Swiss-Prot record:
Gene3D superfamilies: 3.40.1370.10. Keywords: Ribonucleoprotein, Ribosomal protein, RNA-binding, rRNA-binding. Residues 54-65 have a biased composition (Basic residues). GO terms for biological process: translation. One of the primary rRNA binding proteins, this protein initially binds near the 5'-end of the 23S rRNA. It is important during the early stages of 50S assembly. It makes multiple contacts with different domains of the 23S rRNA in the assembled 50S subunit and ribosome. The lineage of its organism: Bacteria, Pseudomonadati, Pseudomonadota, Gammaproteobacteria, Pseudomonadales. One of its GO terms (molecular function) is rRNA binding. This is Large ribosomal subunit protein uL4. Part of the 50S ribosomal subunit. Belongs to the universal ribosomal protein uL4 family. Coiled coil: none annotated. Residues 38-68 are annotated as: Disordered. SUPFAM superfamilies: Ribosomal protein L4 (SSF52166).
Amino acid sequence: MQLNVNDAQAIEVSELTFGGEFNETLVHQAVVAYMAGGRQGSKQQKTRSDVRGGGKRPWRQKGTGRARAGTIRSPIWRGGGTTFAARPQDHTQKLNKKMYRAALRSILAELVRTDRLVVVQDFAVEAPKTKDLLSKLTGMGLTDVLIVSDAVDQNLYLAARNLPHVDVRDVQGSDPVSLIAYDKVLITVSAVKKFEELLG
């Protein structure tokens, strides 16, 4: 299939990578797995056994007329532990490499189908100036955009750093969440070829 390039003639690309059907279920699974993998999972609270003290029972079992109490660190008591205390846990979800690649292919194909993928021969700024990048993007009618190149250009990265709706990634650093989070994805021809190599 052919992919239109903004500032040059159309290029021939793999139907498998850029022309497949959109698998919403698979993309959802990939997004959830990616976001779950980013969770820290280190939250921890103290149960009755973790709280310091409370080893000796406050009063004897029988004969006082009061309710039975075995420890002053009971969750019912002030200064006691938490009833269902949070524990550190691993939130990662397993997703096969084949499924992950298929999800990325599905996203790229959908970007092409919905005219959200803007392909350019090359994209760079001469100096790390946000103003220069902003004027360049405005000239192309792009405001909310992910810029993907085969390798991150330092000037481009620094220029985009202060723009809230602009992100710069290389092909390896692109993930399901970043690819669907922006209105448009601006991608260079070399990045298209690299995606074909990785996902083909």
